């Protein structure tokens, strides 16, 4: 009498690695979507300088320097 033993490999370790890689790539992609800080400056009539820093595309912070 002959026996045939079929051993099926568990695909979970390889599937787990792919899921972790996809999650890491997605998180890096989300972090790269925010725009960088963009400083720009203007000069008033009395030669005092006002510097604006745009953070995240919509928030503007005013920094006055004399």
From Swiss-Prot:
Keyword tags: Membrane, Transmembrane, Transmembrane helix
Key word Transmembrane helix present: yes
A GO cellular-component term linked to this record: membrane
Primary location recorded for the protein, binned into one broad class: membrane
Membrane topology listed for this record: Single-pass membrane protein
Location(s), subcellular: Membrane
TM ranges: 11-31
Source taxon at top rank: Viruses
Protein name (database record): Uncharacterized protein p6
Lineage, broadest ranks: Viruses, Riboviria, Orthornavirae, Kitrinoviricota, Tolucaviricetes
